From Swiss-Prot:
Pathway: Purine metabolism; IMP biosynthesis via de novo pathway; 5-amino-1-(5-phospho-D-ribosyl)imidazole-4-carboxamide from 5-amino-1-(5-phospho-D-ribosyl)imidazole-4-carboxylate: step 1/2. It comes from Desulfosudis oleivorans (strain DSM 6200 / JCM 39069 / Hxd3). This is Phosphoribosylaminoimidazole-succinocarboxamide synthase. Its EC number is 6.3.2.6. It is an enzyme of class 6 (ligase).
Length: 293
């Protein structure tokens, strides 16, 4: 993990888009997804990379794709650069460990969020009216409490610089169709439950997470990243103490730093001090070590 990659520039390859973290190249019915070391918080991309982050995210996603392959098909074709199109070969050193060749899909127009614990925007919503995305929850819950059952709380999809908006199931169904939204909900809950089981055995609580799905030949399959510190809240099981914020293995550390500043959560983002960068990288590395070994 010596090479820091903030953004990629591969002459001869067709850059389809730059997301908040990933650069995506188009190969017809396939895509090359490259996880850079960019970090986003509050839907804004930070100016400072987290060294090695793209490789960590990729290895964790590959781990989970394998762990849940009996639940849902995924878009992965290969993460071995030797299997990539010939045009990728000059960039093999940059691509190795931080990229995937995947099947192109028609992405689902909603984000599929599952919450097993009360934290973040879910906690804020609960404090207002005891609901999260239109789902009523019991009285008396504290911040970071485990919910009686995991809940599906979809959101809109935001472009870089915009904010995702939490929506109800019915609102999601109006966007994506009811049958599709029900399928996405059922898959999301099944993947989350499997993830919780696997992570718990390794000392990690997955408090909440976000999945993305896409259609290929009429089938809804799992795409993008899966149960990573970017898409999830990872808490150490040891030391879990509901009633307040938890220690974490994810970018909450960066969020907390940014909340200590007088920043309006709109671009441009402030610079991250070296210690925040180093500690964030350490937390991501700890998550990888615990999960994958």
């Amino acid at each position: 993990m010596d090479q820091v990659v903030y953004h990629t520039d591969f002459p001869g390859l067709n850059l389809l888009k730059r997301g908040k973290v990933r650069d995506v190249y188009d190969f017809g019915d396939r895509l090359l997804i490259v996880a850079t070391d960019r970090l986003s918080a509050f839907d804004v991309v930070m100016p400072d990379p987290i060294p090695g982050k793209g490789e960590i995210l990729t290895q964790i996603s590959l781990f989970w794709f394998d762990q849940v392959k009996d639940i849902v098909r995924n878009h992965l074709i290969s993460s071995d650069v030797n299997d990539y199109p010939e045009a990728c070969r000059p960039y093999a050193e940059t691509l190795a460990g931080r990229s995937m060749l995947v099947t192109k899909t028609e992405p689902l127009a909603i984000e599929c969020v599952v919450r097993g614990y009360l934290s973040g925007s879910g906690w804020k919503s609960y404090q207002k009216d005891r609901t999260v995305c239109g789902i009523s929850l019991p009285d008396g819950l504290r911040e970071s409490d485990r919910l009686p059952e995991p809940i599906f709380t979809p959101s809109t999809k935001a472009e870089a610089g915009q904010h995702d908006i939490n929506i109800s199931f019915d609102e999601a169904a109006n966007i994506a169709g009811r049958e599709t939204t029900e399928k996405a909900r059922d898959l999301s809950l099944a993947i989350y439950r499997r993830g919780v089981e696997v992570a718990d055995a390794r000392g990690i609580i997955i408090a909440d997470t976000k999945f993305e799905f896409g259609f290929v030949d009429g089938e809804l399959i799992l795409i993008d990243e899966v149960l990573t510190p970017d898409s999830s809240r990872f808490w150490p099981r040891d030391g879990y103490a509901p009633g307040g914020p938890q220690q974490s293995f994810d970018k909450q550390y960066v969020r907390d730093y940014l909340l200590s500043l007088n920043w309006n959560q709109k671009p441009p983002a402030p610079d991250l001090p070296p210690d925040v960068v180093a500690n964030t990288r350490k937390k991501y590395s700890e998550a990888l070590d615990l999960l994958v070994g």
